[in-house]
A protein has these predicted regions:
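Short N-terminal segments immediately surrounding and downstream of signal-peptide cleavage
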Residues: 23-42
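Acidic/histidine-rich alpha-helical segments that form the ligand environment
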Residues: 109-165
Length: 194
């Protein structure tokens, strides 16, 4: 229920901000880099790098691409997108010191997942850029035994690294299914020559 309400709010926000055009989604290009290196701007930039890669990994797909899986035991591209969507919430929640709740992305289309994931990453990047002391941030979980807080370090080797890894899987899956990512994407520069 909350997942659908959250997505609706993100969608309405995106209509107001971008005129609902896919070309106006965040991360078509990576934002300009900050003028100062701080612990927070470096992590914000890592999130931006993920957002840029995810944008292009999920741009101009076909149904065949979404259904593709390299093995019967593997996740499909669509299922991988669902997983990245969940990871994007963990990154966003950690950037705001909010508790992670299990989210169920059922009933979401690939476009819904893409939109929500990109906006989660954009929001997390913006929040991270404002953090003055990373030691104050934790990745928080609430369960039947109570709340568990882990240091922010776990965001780096956990959901952030995992989301980058799985975005690479989507790129590989697309190549294997015959619809490679746009060859003009330059992940080093964060720009795309169209």
């Amino acid at each position: 229920m909350w997942s659908r309400i959250y997505f609706l709010l993100i969608y309405v926000f995106s209509l107001n901000v971008s005129g609902s055009a896919q070309s106006e989604l965040p991360y078509k290009e990576i934002p300009s880099y900050p003028t100062n290196y701080t612990q927070s701007t470096v992590i914000s930039r890592m999130i931006d790098g993920l957002g840029y890669r995810y944008y292009w990994a999920t741009e101009n797909w076909r149904a065949l691409d979404l259904d593709f899986k390299p093995d019967t035991l593997a996740r499909s591209t669509f299922e991988t997108m669902e997983h990245i969507y969940g990871l994007s919430f963990m990154i966003l929640n950690a950037s705001k010191n909010q508790v992670n709740e299990r989210r169920d992305p059922d009933q979401m289309t690939a476009n819904d997942l893409r939109l929500a994931t990109l906006y989660n990453l954009k929001s997390a990047s913006a929040a991270m850029a404002l953090v003055e002391n990373l030691e104050e941030l934790n990745i928080l979980f609430e369960g039947s035994t109570g709340r568990k807080a882990l240091p922010f370090w776990y965001v780096l080797n956990g959901p952030l690294a995992d989301a980058i890894y799985h975005t690479g899987q989507i790129v590989s899956f697309r190549r294997t299914s015959g619809n490679p990512m746009n060859s003009k994407v330059n992940v080093f520069m964060g720009k795309t020559d169209l």
